[in-house]
Amino acid sequence: MVSLKDSHFDLFHLPAQFALDDAALDDAYRTVQTQVHPDRFAAAGDAQKRIAMQWATRANEAYRTLRDPLQRASYLLSLRGVDIGAENNTAMEPAFLMQQMEWREGIEDAAAARNVDALDALLAELRDEKRVRIERLGTLLDSGADQAAAEAVRQLMFIERVASEVGAQIERLET
């Protein structure tokens, strides 16, 4: 029997690894939700309803975490005792720092020129960069290179923030 304290992977009876079969995760989630959904316990006592709600909440949280590659990577690293240090570890490779500056300048220039096409192109570039880096992250995690994976997670978090800023700029310019 799985407990509320077991890992997300254990909850869904999946291997604790980065590479996951999305269909297997979806199926496992539906199975767990079917078993613990609060509607199944409508006629039960308050204690059982509360427990069902806890399990349903836990299943939703676990599913959201495992469904998102970046969250899954962060979670895997936390299970391995690796703190990604996103709040206080901002040290990054010089090449990535240069890339950050280029992206920021691209955002500023395109926003100042009200150039939505340039922002769209930058957003596409960021999405491609994220895809490539997530593939690399999977290789790092599944090979046990946890410190390099933590660095990759921090970089991906930055890429997501920049992509969000680009999206906000596009929205602002289109309204």
UniProtKB/Swiss-Prot annotation:
It comes from the Bacteria. GO terms for biological process: [2Fe-2S] cluster assembly; protein complex oligomerization; protein folding. One of its GO terms (molecular function) is protein-folding chaperone binding. InterPro entries: DnaJ_domain, HscB, HscB_C_sf, HscB_oligo_C, J_dom_sf. One of its GO terms (cellular component) is iron-sulfur cluster transfer complex. The keyword Chaperone applies. The keyword Oxidoreductase does not apply. Keywords: Chaperone. Residues 7-79 form the J domain. Interacts with HscA and stimulates its ATPase activity. Co-chaperone involved in the maturation of iron-sulfur cluster-containing proteins. Seems to help targeting proteins to be folded toward HscA. Belongs to the HscB family. NCBIfam families: hscB, PRK03578.1. This is Co-chaperone protein HscB homolog. It comes from Burkholderia vietnamiensis (strain G4 / LMG 22486) (Burkholderia cepacia (strain R1808)). The lineage of its organism: Bacteria, Pseudomonadati, Pseudomonadota, Betaproteobacteria, Burkholderiales.
